[in-house]
């Protein structure tokens, strides 16, 4: 046996006893014979092979084979009683730690249940060549076509003898890049003196081509860029990769490794990220609600390009809780507009919510019978003034000459016939049906919010209280709609309402167009309910089953029960078809109330022929609106007070209603008899205090009239008209 002259004394002693260990090992043909011999010993009785395996891994070497620490032992263990195993102290501990580290580093995942033969091979030496050699051989036995013949075993023993003599030349390990199934790993290469030619008969497949020189391993070719959406490579064990490098011939060259050694080979490349999808950023398209897309006005692009200095205010035409409304002229175009000033004095949270709602809703509603919002402007002030004071916001609307309340109160200027009233009311229903169809509630229908221009075109305005309606799925406030136009369900505290509330208000306006007076002008909610009950009947469970669910029903107590008498009250002043539509719009139960769309299909509306309707004769020199009407009433009242006559004082009391017609005192005195004659028969008790009591009349039913009263009665031929005026005009 050749021993390298450069080896140490310890190496020579160990290698000298190597032959004896090989001869002793050849007596056992398989690992099973070791187990059978071990079972004869008393120290291995009743221990299973797996348990013994795990127990041997944590016990000292001299206890695994019944070695004696003093150096004595059987013939099989005589070769292990070498100086390297008898020596105590630091050298022995270092060798034991080195053996445990080498076993853990080179142990394959399937070595946990290996035989004793492989364990003795691991403990036979501590040099790097033996450790690497045994690791490669064990893998070749597992994965190659290695038989159990004695010839193969003898060759393996000769190979171990030959490799032990070259321990000095195998001190350094080189990185061997190996590729298997697309996975690039790094394995420890065999020593330079390792010759694989004697092992070629052990493989069933043809021999692989010779390995490339060492320089190629040190400078591998650059890694190609990974293809997008590539399949992640499978996980490959490092020991199997080292074996596969000798058996697979069609392996591509490996990419360079950043870190050498076995520890870096277990690191897999991160999963390739897919390329970023090129999404086209599209702007959201804002359309009207519920699929009713309409074209925006052509001047919407000119918003926010002007301020208040571009307008000249002419006169104030309205005022309310929201602010003031002014008539103005655009200095650039000469067009008349209406500037609605948004009041900010009492706002603690900035811009009022009612103005925000009106702006949002009006920008979604585009109809010929709805007023058009044109722009929003602010005061032309500097930044320093803006810090000290609040800027005024103005909503710019198209200017409409009149409102309906101003036209109704100017009887000497405007007079409507039945066809003209039907034409105006049809336009009102068309605008209201459009609002409801787009999913909104107006919640403030009244005469002052209905505008009419000089061409006779009607437009709905003031959508500050409008809200989006969600099919009665949520609660809304019942403190909406002016009291005179408020439906009974809101008066009783209903908070789950729908478009029927606007239909009731529109029905009140239908009667007001013919009578020129509000139908129900109560002073409070209970008084308003009492007036409604006198004309529309008392609400009860029979005609309104959901009445008991309302909050105000338990606290509302009527003085008496009234019958419904709408047709009797209005048949003599309205067409029969119009009375039928009014009756359906003033239904107490909101579930049975007609809708705006259904009202457009009513026979009275459908019978209208626009070719036969005469155009409205509206005043061209005077704009009739609510504020102008109030000024006229105030001046007339001051003029009557200046006269100082006793009759004028009575006339003022008789016309104390804000929209009652002014009548001379003689006319009022003359009509006292007829009006008081029917006072208890009709339900106009809210005017009774304005009429002087008459002591010569009996309680109802009235007695037969005397000759004088009969003569006076004959002098007034239109008796039904006189009766109606006593109810609604006094």
UniProtKB/Swiss-Prot annotation:
Residues 204-230 have a biased composition (Pro residues). GO terms for cellular component: cyclin/CDK positive transcription elongation factor complex; euchromatin; nucleus. One of its GO terms (biological process) is positive regulation of transcription elongation by RNA polymerase II. Residues 194-203 have a biased composition (Low complexity). SMART domains: S_TKc. It comes from the Eukaryota. The keyword Nucleotidyltransferase does not apply. Residues 9-21, 75-94 have a biased composition (Basic and acidic residues). Its EC number is 2.7.11.22, 2.7.11.23. ATP binds at residues 317-325, 340, 398-403, 625. Residues 95-122, 151-163, 676-688 have a biased composition (Basic residues). Residues 313-605 form the Protein kinase domain. Keywords: ATP-binding, Kinase, Nucleotide-binding, Nucleus, Serine/threonine-protein kinase, Transferase. PROSITE patterns: PROTEIN_KINASE_ATP, PROTEIN_KINASE_DOM, PROTEIN_KINASE_ST. Residues 57-67, 714-730 have a biased composition (Polar residues). Residues 1-230, 246-283, 623-730 are annotated as: Disordered. The active site is at 444 (proton acceptor). GO terms for molecular function: ATP binding; cyclin binding; cyclin-dependent protein serine/threonine kinase activity; protein serine kinase activity; RNA polymerase II CTD heptapeptide repeat kinase activity. The keyword DNA repair does not apply. It is found in: Nucleus. Its main location: nucleus. Cyclin-dependent kinase which displays CTD kinase activity: hyperphosphorylates 'Ser-2' in the C-terminal heptapeptide repeat domain (CTD) of the largest RNA polymerase II subunit, thereby acting as a key regulator of transcription elongation. Required for normal reproduction. Belongs to the protein kinase superfamily. CMGC Ser/Thr protein kinase family. CDC2/CDKX subfamily. This is Cyclin-dependent kinase 12. It comes from Caenorhabditis elegans. The gene is cdk-12.
């Amino acid at each position: 046996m050749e021993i390298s002259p450069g080896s140490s004394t310890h190496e020579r002693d160990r290698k000298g006893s190597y032959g004896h260990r090989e001869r002793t090992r050849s007596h056992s043909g398989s690992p099973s014979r070791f187990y059978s011999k071990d079972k004869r010993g008393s120290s291995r009785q009743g221990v299973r092979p797996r348990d013994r395996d795990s127990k041997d891994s944590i016990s000292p070497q001299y206890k695994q084979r019944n070695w004696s620490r003093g150096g004595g032992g059987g013939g099989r263990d005589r070769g292990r009683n070498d100086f390297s195993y008898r020596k105590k102290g630091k050298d022995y501990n270092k060798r034991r730690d080195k053996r445990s580290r080498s076993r853990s580093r080179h142990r394959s995942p399937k070595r946990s249940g290996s035989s004793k033969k492989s364990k003795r091979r691991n403990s036979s030496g501590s040099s790097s060549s033996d450790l690497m050699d045994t690791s490669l051989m064990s893998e070749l036995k597992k994965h190659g076509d290695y038989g159990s013949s004695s010839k193969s075993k003898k060759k393996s023993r000769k190979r171990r003898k030959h490799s032990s003599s070259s321990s000095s030349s195998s001190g350094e390990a080189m990185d061997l890049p190996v590729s298997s199934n697309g996975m690039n790993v790094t394995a420890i290469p065999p020593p330079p003196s390792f010759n694989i030619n004697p092992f070629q008969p052990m493989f069933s497949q043809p021999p692989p081509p010779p390995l490339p020189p060492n320089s190629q391993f040190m400078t591998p070719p650059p890694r190609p860029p990974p293809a997008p959406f590539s399949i992640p490579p499978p996980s490959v064990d490092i020991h199997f990769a080292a074996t596969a490098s000798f058996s697979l011939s069609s392996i591509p060259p490996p990419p360079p490794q950043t870190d050498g050694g076995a520890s870096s080979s277990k690191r897999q490349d991160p999963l390739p990220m897919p390329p970023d999808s090129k999404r086209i950023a599209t702007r959201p398209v804002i359309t009207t609600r519920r699929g009713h897309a309409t074209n925006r006005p052509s001047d919407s692009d000119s918003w926010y390009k002007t301020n208040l200095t571009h307008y000249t205010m002419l006169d104030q035409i309205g005022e309310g809780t929201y602010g003031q409304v002014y008539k103005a002229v655009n200095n650039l175009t000469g067009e008349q507009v209406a500037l609605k000033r948004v009041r900010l004095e009492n706002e603690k949270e900035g811009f009022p919510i009612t103005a925000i709602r009106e702006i949002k809703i009006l920008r979604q509603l585009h109809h010929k019978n709805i007023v058009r919002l044109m722009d929003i402007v602010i005061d032309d002030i500097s930044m320093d003034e803006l810090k000290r004071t609040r800027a005024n916001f103005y909503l710019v609307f198209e200017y409409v000459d009149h409102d309906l309340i101003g036209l109704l109160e100017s009887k000497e200027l405007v007079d409507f016939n039945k066809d003209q009233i039907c034409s105006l009311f049809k336009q009102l229903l068309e605008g209201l049906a459009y609002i409801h169809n787009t999913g909104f509630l107006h919640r403030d229908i009244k005469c002052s919010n209905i505008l009419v221009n000089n061409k006779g075109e009607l437009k709905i305005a003031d959508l500050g209280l409008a809200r989006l309606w969600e099919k009665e799925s949520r609660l809304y406030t019942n403190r909406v709609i002016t009291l005179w136009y408020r439906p009974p369900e809101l008066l009783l505290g209903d908070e789950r309402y729908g478009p029927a509330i606007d239909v009731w208000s529109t029905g009140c306006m239908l009667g007001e167009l013919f009578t020129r007076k509000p139908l129900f002008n109560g002073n409070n909610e209970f008084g308003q309910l009492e007036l409604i009950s006198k004309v529309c009947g008392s609400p009860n469970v029979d005609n309104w089953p959901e009445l008991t669910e309302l909050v105000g029903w338990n606290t509302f107590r009527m003085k008496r029960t009234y019958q419904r008498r709408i047709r009797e009250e209005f048949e003599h002043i309205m067409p029969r078809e119009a009375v039928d539509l009014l009756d359906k719009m003033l239904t107490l139960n909101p579930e049975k109330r007609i809708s705006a769309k259904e009202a457009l299909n009513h026979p009275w509306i459908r019978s209208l022929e626009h070719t036969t309707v005469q155009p409205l004769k509206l005043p061209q020199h005077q704009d009739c609106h609510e504020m102008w009407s109030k000024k006229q009433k105030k001046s007339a009242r001051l003029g009557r007070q200046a006269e100082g006559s006793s009759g004028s004082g009575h006339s003022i009391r008789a016309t104390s209603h804000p929209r009652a017609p002014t009548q001379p005192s003689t006319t009022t005195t003359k009509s006292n008899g007829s009006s008081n004659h029917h006072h208890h028969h009709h339900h106009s008790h809210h005017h009774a205090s304005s009429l002087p009591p008459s002591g010569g009349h009996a309680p109802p039913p009235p007695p037969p009239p005397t000759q004088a009263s009969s003569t006076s009665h004959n002098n007034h031929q239109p008796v039904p008209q006189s009766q109606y005026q006593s109810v609604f005009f006094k």
